Amino acid sequence: MPRKQRDIERGLVNKGFQRTESHHHFFVYHSCDGKKTAVKTKTSHGTREVSSYILQQMARQLYLSKIDFLNLIDCPMSRHQYEEHLIGLAKIP
């Protein structure tokens, strides 16, 4: 179940992640009140399709199961639900 990198990046930005550029595209989560958090993931510049393995790794970086990560980027999981999940895990205050 590979996904297009463009769709993943768009989904992350829509859920409160802000993109920064370097040798990779980094996405750092900013809480609903605008505070930067330590929750982050990255995508490569050269990849158009993201493999199932990489999706699993990105999910782990964001403290989600692979299914929940796909729900986050495909929109069934809202930003508020994701933030509540992170608060429940004590990853953000």
Language model features with spans:
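Short acidic DE-rich linear segments
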Residues: 90-93
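Amphipathic alpha-helical segments
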Residues: 1-18
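C-terminal structural segments of small proteins and small subunits
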Residues: 61-88
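Charged/polar, solvent-exposed surface patches and flexible loops
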Residues: 10, 14, 60, 71
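A short, structured beta-strand/loop element
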Residues: 19-60
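Alpha-helical structural elements
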Residues: 12, 22-24, 64, 77
